[in-house]
């Protein structure tokens, strides 16, 4: 049963009050570390700037734009790279422009690209830490959390934006998250709603195959996708023993294929991302037996060539067939729901989320099918937050942050088991009672730092 708009209002009202307590609690940072690291990052940025200026890319850039040259300008980079230097674009943006994101730049093969990417990375890390220093008061940050700024009715953060701390790049994550530390004698505890958007989507489309995956803890749709993508016949259990499967091929199946497909991408960019991004295979020309990352010591190209996949063109056609398998054979009910949902949106111009909120206006196909999932996925976390904040008033621990699909605690080490158990119980028992449209198990994953450690070094709570 879909909630009413009044139910949605009450959720945001209670959530705003709970987030106010999270803001008031504050999150501790290592101020001295931030200052030292900012100085180091600025020095490294100056060095990268000098190297970029002396490279082929930098010289062409300065020749075209002279005093107005800006390394941060995307349009300038497009002109230099794709017009002056004649590089063939690797991919385009949704607006049809030649892309200059990291993935596209790494395929360009131009002297100076590494220095530009390094400069970008250094700037991103520096900007995060400088924001920390700007907004800290007595060694604590008190970021604002908003519930009224995002179209999908998710939260946002500002002053500083704690939800913008890097996580995908290992160095960026380590440098920035190392600044977040617990109160003396405490630990940082992060509890994450695992795969929450996939679970919420399943509550809409009710595809039997997807429900089976989500209800069976031993099932692994990402490993199954990797088996299809890479012509692997062994059982998932045996494959996970092979070096490179879980760390590369399964992740390629998950983040390079399954999730992009669920969010509306199609086979061609997926093939490029899986092959060239995850597996480090060449974009141009035939692959050799020595190309790509190894699977159990054997280069992946050697394995693919045994299945008549000799280059990116062949692999792209193979991924097209895997895409057909995904939607026509594996998840046909999910596919039909996407078509029907978008058609209904086109007729009405709006739709109502499971949690009661209404979205309307001009939307792309991807927006119209993703928004009803993204909003309720966050609302499950928000309801969890309100319950936890209310129940730990007599605890020494405090919720100090809400990051995407997770809650961040400044926790007393002795209270960690109780906190994890509380969130697990809310997810597994209380939320399904509150919202009877939840028809799949909701799981959580918890990670914890050492006592007086940092957010950068976390271990899984068993």
Predicted regions: what is each one?
Residues 36-71, 75, 319, 324-334, ...:
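Polymerase palm active-site segment centered on the conserved acidic dipeptide of motif C
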Residues 1-172, 181-187, 194-197, 267, ...:
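Conserved "right-hand" nucleotidyltransferase catalytic core of DNA-directed polymerases
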Residues 191, 213-217, 373:
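Conserved, non-catalytic sequence blocks in retroelement Pol enzymes and Pol-derived host proteins
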Residues 24, 142, 148-150, 231-402, ...:
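Conserved catalytic core of nucleic-acid polymerases
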Residues 153, 192, 226, 270, ...:
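Hydrophobic, well-ordered secondary-structure elements that form the walls
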Residues 197-232, 281-291, 356-358:
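Metal-dependent catalytic core segments for phosphate chemistry
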Residues 158-165, 175-183, 188-200, 204-205, ...:
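Core catalytic machinery and nucleic-acid-binding channels of phosphodiester-processing enzymes
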Residues 77-85, 194-209, 229-230, 413-416:
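Short active-site loop/helix that positions an aromatic residue
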């Amino acid at each position: 049963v879909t909630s009413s708009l009044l139910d949605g209002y009450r959720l945001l009202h209670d959530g705003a009050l709970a987030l106010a307590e999270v803001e008031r609690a504050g999150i501790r940072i290592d101020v001295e570390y931030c200052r030292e690291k900012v100085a180091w990052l600025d020095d490294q940025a100056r060095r990268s700037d000098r190297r970029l200026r002396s490279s082929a890319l930098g010289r062409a850039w300065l020749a075209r734009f002279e005093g107005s040259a800006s390394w941060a300008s995307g349009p300038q980079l497009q002109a230099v790279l794709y017009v002056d230097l004649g590089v063939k674009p690797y991919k385009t943006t949704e607006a049809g422009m030649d892309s200059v994101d990291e993935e596209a730049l790494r395929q360009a093969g131009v002297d100076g690209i590494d220095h530009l990417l390094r400069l970008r990375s250094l700037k991103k890390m520096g900007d995060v830490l400088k924001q920390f220093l700007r907004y800290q008061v007595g060694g604590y940050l008190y970021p604002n959390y908003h519930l009224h700024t995002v179209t999908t009715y998710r939260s946002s953060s500002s002053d500083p934006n704690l939800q913008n701390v890097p996580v995908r790049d290992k160095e960026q994550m380590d440098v920035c998250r190392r600044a977040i530390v617990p109160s003396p004698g405490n630990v940082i505890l992060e509890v994450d709603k695992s795969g929450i958007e996939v679970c919420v989507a399943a509550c809409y489309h009710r595809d039997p195959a997807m429900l089976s995956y989500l209800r069976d803890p031993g099932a692994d749709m990402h490993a199954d996708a990797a088996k299809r993508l890479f012509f692997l016949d062994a059982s998932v259990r045996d494959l996970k023993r092979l070096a490179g499967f879980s760390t590369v091929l399964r992740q390629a199946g998950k983040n390079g294929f399954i999730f992009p497909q669920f969010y509306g991408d199609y086979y061609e960019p997926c093939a490029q991302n899986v092959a060239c991004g995850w597996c480090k295979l060449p974009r141009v020309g035939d692959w050799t037996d020595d190309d790509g990352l190894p699977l159990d010591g054997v280069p992946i190209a050697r394995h693919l060539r045994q299945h008549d996949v000799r280059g990116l063109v062949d692999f792209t056609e193979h991924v097209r067939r895997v895409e057909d398998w995904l939607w026509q054979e594996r998840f046909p009910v999910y596919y039909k729901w996407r078509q029907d949902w978008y058609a209904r949106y086109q007729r009405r111009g709006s739709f109502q989320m499971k949690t009661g909120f209404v979205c309307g206006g001009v939307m792309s196909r991807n927006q119209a099918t993703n928004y009803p999932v993204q909003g309720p996925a966050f609302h499950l976390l928000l309801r969890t937050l309100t319950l936890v904040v209310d129940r730990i008033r007599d605890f020494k621990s405090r919720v100090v942050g809400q990051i995407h699909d997770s809650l961040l605690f400044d926790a007393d080490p002795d209270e960690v088991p109780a906190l994890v158990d509380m969130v697990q119980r809310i997810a597994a028992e209380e939320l399904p009672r509150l919202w009877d449209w939840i028809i799949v198990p909701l799981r959580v994953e918890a990670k914890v730092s050492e006592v007086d450690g940092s957010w950068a070094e976390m271990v899984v709570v068993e």
